[in-house]
C-alpha cells in the first residue's frame, strides 16, 4: 500500500536527480575540454539556472501536480482524476505532448524568454493597419478565458498617472556641453603637456647617454693607440734583443754547428706577436740551460777520470 504522497516524493526525487545529472554533465564537459573550474561555483551556477528554468517554465509544478493527482487517485479521491479523464484515453499521446511542451518551455526560459513574456505573447497579438503607422492590439482566446475566470486585474496607478511634458532648456544644455568641452580640452592639453615633458626628458636622457657612449669610445680608442704603441715597442725590443744575441754569438769562438743551432733557435723567435716571442725566449733559455748542464756533467766526468778534484767558490 503506497503512502499518501509517495508519487509526489518520487517526482521531487526525479527532479533532484535531474539536477545532479546536470551538474555531473557540466563538470564532465569542462574536464574533457581541459578547463579548470571551481566545483562550488559550477554547482551554484547550475542550481540557479536549473531552478529558474524549472520554475519559470512550469515543468516542476506540472510534474508535481500530476503526481498529486495520482496520489489522490491512489487514496480513493477520484475528483482530480475524473477531471483529467481525457488523459486515460491514450497515455502515450498526452505523455509525448506533455514532454514536448515541457521541453519548449525550458528552452524558452534558458533563452531569456520568461513566463511574463510568454503569457503576454499568448494573450495579445498586434495587427498593423495598412497605410498607417498605428496598429490594433487584439486579445486572443486565452485573454478572453482569463477575463471570464476573473484572472485579469486593472492597476489604477498607471491610469491615474499624469503625463508630464518636459521643456528643454537649450541654453543650459548648451552651457553644459560647453563646460564638458572645456573640461575635455583642459584634460587633453594637460595630457599633451605631460607627454611633451616626458618626451623632452627622454630626449635629454638619450643625449646624455650618447655623450657617455662617445666618451667611452674615445677612451677605448686611446687605450687602443696606447696598446699598439706598447706592442710596437715590444716588437722593437725583441728585434734588438735577437740582433744583439746574434752579434754576440758571432764574436764567440764556438763550434760552427753550435752557433748554427743557437742562431736557428734565435731566428725562430716570433717578433710580430710579443706573447709568442716570450714563449720562444723561454724555450731558448731552457735549451741553453740544458746544454750548459750537459756540458758541466761531461766536464765533471772527465775530471773524475783523471783523478782530479773540483770545488766551487773563491779562496
From Swiss-Prot:
Ranges where the record places region Interaction with host EIF4G1: 208-315
Renumbered residue ranges of the record's region Interaction with host ZC3H7B: 170-234
Disulfide bonds: none
Organism domain of life: Viruses
InterPro entries for the chain: NSP3_N_rotavirus, NSP3_sf, Rotavirus_NSP3
Region (RNA-binding): 1-149
Protein's name according to its UniProt entry: Non-structural protein 3
Chief place of localization: host cell
Span list, region Dimerization: 150-206
Pfam families attached to this UniProt entry: Rota_NSP3
An individual GO BP term: regulation of translation
CDD domains according to UniProt: NSP3_rotavirus
Coiled-coil annotated spans: 166-237
Cellular-component GO terms for this entry: host cell cytoplasm
UniProt GO MF annotations: RNA binding
Organism of provenance: Rotavirus A (strain RVA/SA11-4F/G3P6[1])
Keyword Coiled coil belongs to the record: yes
Function of the molecule: Plays an important role in stimulating the translation of viral mRNAs. These mRNAs are capped but not polyadenylated, instead terminating in a conserved sequence 'GACC' at the 3' that is recognized by NSP3, which competes with host PABPC1 for EIF4G1 binding. The interaction between NSP3 and host EIF4G1 stabilizes the EIF4E-EIF4G1 interaction, thereby facilitating the initiation of capped mRNA translation.
Keyword annotations of the record: Coiled coil, Host cytoplasm, Host-virus interaction, RNA-binding, Translation regulation
Binding partners and assembly: Homodimer. Interacts (via the coiled-coil region) with host ZC3H7B (via LD motif). Interacts with host EIF4G1.
HAMAP family with a match to the protein in the record: ROTA_A_NSP3, ROTA_NSP3
Family label: Belongs to the rotavirus NSP3 family.
Subcellular location: Host cytoplasm
